[in-house]
Amino acid sequence: MKNQEIHLPTPNPEHPYGGGNGRYRFPDINGMNLLGDNISLPPIVPKSFHIMLTVFHPETLYGMKKWLPFCEDLRKQYKHTPTPVEYSILLVLQPPPIEGDVPAFTQALGDFPDFYMKTNSLISYYDQSFVRRRLSLHKKAETAIVLLDGNGNIIWKDDGGFTVSRAEHLKVILETLSPLAPRTRTH
């Protein structure tokens, strides 16, 4: 991975979702976390990064769970740096709500004893095609992993489940963008 080039999206000031600064912005989505609190994503936390594990069907949550240990390691590594890394799981379901959606979501994620995950897992009923368009995803995409800056702008994204190469690519991007990033050893 070290010899590969890092490809970040080129800002486009004419992009309709750019907000004038040329960056693609993650859509503002409201929903409920696993504690029953209404929250909005993406969080706006300047000088930080946020990984959005975005899922469009409860069945695909099982595959996205493989990202959780990797994201938790990144969160711990960057916790005491000037550019902390946080993460969330976002389940975007097509409205109207169907009875059993929330239990299916919690069952798919497992019984989280972890307050962080209960707080940062969001279920939302939103137009899936709109979210896919905003993320420039294929119209049938089931998942996306999206790296955001502290203002909710998209830095990098990929669609699909966890692979070592995707994880390494994300790690290299974070190390490149965060000048005081913790350096990790690769075995």
PLM regions: where:
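Thiol-/selenol-based redox modules, centered on thioredoxin-like
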Residues: 132-133, 140-187
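Structural microenvironment flanking redox-active thiols in thiol-disulfide oxidoreductases
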Residues: 50, 60-114
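N-proximal helix/coil linker or "cap" segments that precede and/or mark the start of modular domains
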Residues: 1-27
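A short beta-strand-turn-helix
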Residues: 29-50
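Thioredoxin-like thiol-disulfide oxidoreductase module
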Residues: 9, 96-141, 173
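Hydrophobic beta-strand anchors of alpha/beta hydrolase catalytic cores
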Residues: 51-52, 145
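Domain-scale activation on soluble regions of proteins
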Residues: 4-6, 32-34, 160
